[in-house]
């Protein structure tokens, strides 16, 4: 315990060598790559490039000279390609960072999966209540928390890429401070949720169950926020595997707690056992990451809690606000489909819960690579490698397309049996089976949308992502969806077709922005932020 508190509140930086975000290159290759982009890490100064771009013995001399061409917005990908070895290297880096993250996010998603699975077999009213509870938690809290935490995708990754690891810890402390303040209004909303849902004309029985669920779930929100912030703090430093190990223990624990607290004949207490199980799991995950940071054999720089975290909050607030705008609008449009399904009846709402849980589960795979892409691009920008960051974004899009097609094909192949995992109600099963072909197409578009959003966060363009989310979801797709559902009585099919329309619009806008990005300007903006921490 003495070691724990001494590290937690230490005023002196942790000793130990800070791992380089690009330690996979040799020292000579790192020097030459830095010179290509006019950035010398040892002097921390920007110098205009004046030598050909070379990658050691990786690429022939003719290609090395061609690579010295400075990329300008609007050029074709073929003109900017840095040679197959470099593309292969960036792909391997994304796979290295993304593979453990896929496992971690699938395990984390299984926590929601197991809750819906457990409550679904209590009855469709309980399944509908869990759907509304999940929607409420996502819109009113978790999306807001994720928006704040997304600021670390920009600030922390670029600080670590610039070899300023202690700035990463300061950014984490500022993030936790903002999250603590935001939890107060969240708790007030959840305490009065039953009355809010009745005012919104939801079924009184479902509203009552949802209100009881969320009053207990207030205990889960801080655990979720702390875990997500610490997770992003480690990911920003290229540390992914320990998060997977923690979730390998947490996911089975959540399943066990769901059984004991919901179904066990002696200690179980039914419906309210589910939020208690989730809250316990969230806090277990947070405590495990805190212990890892304090006692890990891998040096994780931590300067102790500092008053500096209370100063110069404007960059963090700037990226947090635009991150919230980007994620909240996207999540709200996604989760509002449950509210719309609630107007269609209990069976469509229960079906929507299964459909949203299924998409959420498979979404974790492309989203994991979106996090890996954001981290990799942030490191490259922080270390002054604008051209490599641009190339990495192209590789990330190609990888996302392959993964998303695989996910969509998987859900289409298992459409006949998937719904029975959640419920035995024949009416709900018929609706779910009917929607699955449309759902498979949505999964493809949603995966590309996820990676595009991750790249925007890695480059510090959350504000553009927010505008894209608002435009694609609310100004375009929502009016079309309402018109189709109301006037043509298409039900859930119309809702999911509207979601596909929103994703396609967002993908088009994201790709246009990233394709025309001035990456050297992004690099200079990042360097300016790093000098004003």
Swiss-Prot record:
InterPro entries named in the record: MATE_euk, MATE_fam
Pfam families: MatE (PF01554)
UniProt GO molecular function: antiporter activity; transmembrane transporter activity; xenobiotic transmembrane transporter activity
Record's GO cellular component terms: fungal-type vacuole; membrane; vacuolar membrane
Modification Phosphotyrosine, positions: 25
Phosphoserine modifications at: 20, 23, 26
GO BP field: xenobiotic detoxification by transmembrane export across the plasma membrane
NCBIfam families cross-referenced by the UniProt entry: matE
Family: Belongs to the multi antimicrobial extrusion (MATE) (TC 2.A.66.1) family.
Protein name, entry field: Uncharacterized transporter C323.07c
């Amino acid at each position: 315990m003495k070691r724990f508190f001494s590290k937690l509140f230490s005023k002196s930086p942790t000793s130990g060598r800070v791992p380089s975000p690009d330690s996979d290159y040799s020292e000579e290759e790192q020097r030459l790559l830095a010179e290509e982009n006019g950035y010398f890490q040892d002097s921390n100064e920007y110098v205009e490039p004046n030598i050909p771009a070379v990658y050691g013995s990786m690429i022939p001399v003719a290609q090395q000279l061609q690579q010295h061409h400075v990329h300008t917005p609007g050029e074709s990908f073929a003109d900017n390609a840095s040679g197959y070895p470099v593309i292969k290297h960036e792909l391997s880096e994304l796979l290295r960072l993304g593979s453990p993250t896929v496992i971690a996010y699938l395990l984390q998603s299984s926590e929601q999966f197991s809750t819906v699975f457990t409550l679904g077999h209590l009855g469709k009213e309980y399944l509908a209540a869990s759907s509304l509870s999940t929607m409420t938690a996502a819109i009113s809290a978790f999306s807001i928390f994720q928006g704040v935490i997304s600021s670390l995708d920009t600030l922390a990754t670029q600080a670590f890429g610039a070899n300023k690891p202690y700035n990463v810890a300061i950014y984490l402390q500022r993030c936790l401070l903002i999250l603590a303040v935001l939890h107060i209004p969240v708790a007030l909303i959840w305490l009065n949720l039953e009355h809010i849902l009745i005012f919104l004309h939801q079924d009184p029985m479902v509203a009552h169950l949802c209100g009881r669920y969320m009053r207990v779930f207030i205990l889960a929100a801080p655990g979720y926020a702390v875990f997500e912030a610490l997770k992003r703090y480690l990911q920003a430093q290229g540390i992914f595997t320990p998060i997977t190990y923690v979730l390998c223990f947490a996911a089975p624990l959540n399943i066990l707690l769901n059984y004991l607290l919901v179904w066990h004949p002696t200690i179980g207490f039914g419906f309210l056992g589910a939020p208690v199980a989730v809250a316990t799991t969230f806090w277990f995950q947070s405590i495990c990451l805190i212990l890892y940071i304090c006692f890990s054999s891998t040096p994780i720089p931590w300067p102790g809690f500092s008053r500096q975290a209370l100063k110069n909050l404007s960059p963090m607030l700037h990226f947090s606000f635009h991150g919230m705008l980007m994620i909240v609008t996207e999540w709200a449009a996604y989760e509002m489909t449950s509210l719309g399904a609630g107007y269609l009846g209990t069976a469509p709402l229960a079906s929507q819960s299964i459909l949203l849980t299924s998409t959420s589960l498979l979404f974790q795979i492309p989203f994991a690579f979106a996090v890996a892409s954001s981290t990799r691009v942030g490191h490259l920008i922080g270390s002054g490698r604008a051209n490599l960051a641009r190339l990495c974004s192209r590789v990330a899009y190609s990888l996302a397309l392959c993964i998303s097609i695989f996910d969509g094909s998987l859900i289409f192949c298992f459409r006949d049996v998937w719904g029975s995992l959640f419920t035995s109600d024949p009416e709900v099963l018929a609706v779910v089976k009917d929607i699955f072909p449309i759902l498979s197409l949505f999964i493809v578009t949603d995966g590309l949308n996820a990676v595009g959003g991750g790249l925007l966060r890695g480059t510090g363009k959350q504000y553009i992502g927010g505008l894209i989310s608002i435009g694609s979801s609310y100004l375009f797709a929502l009016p079309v969806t309402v018109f189709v559902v109301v006037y043509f009585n298409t039900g859930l099919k119309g809702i999911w077709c509207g979601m596909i329309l929103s994703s396609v619009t967002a993908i088009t806008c994201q790709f246009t922005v990233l394709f025309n990005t001035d990456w050297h300007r992004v690099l200079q903006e990042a360097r300016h932020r790093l000098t004003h921490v």
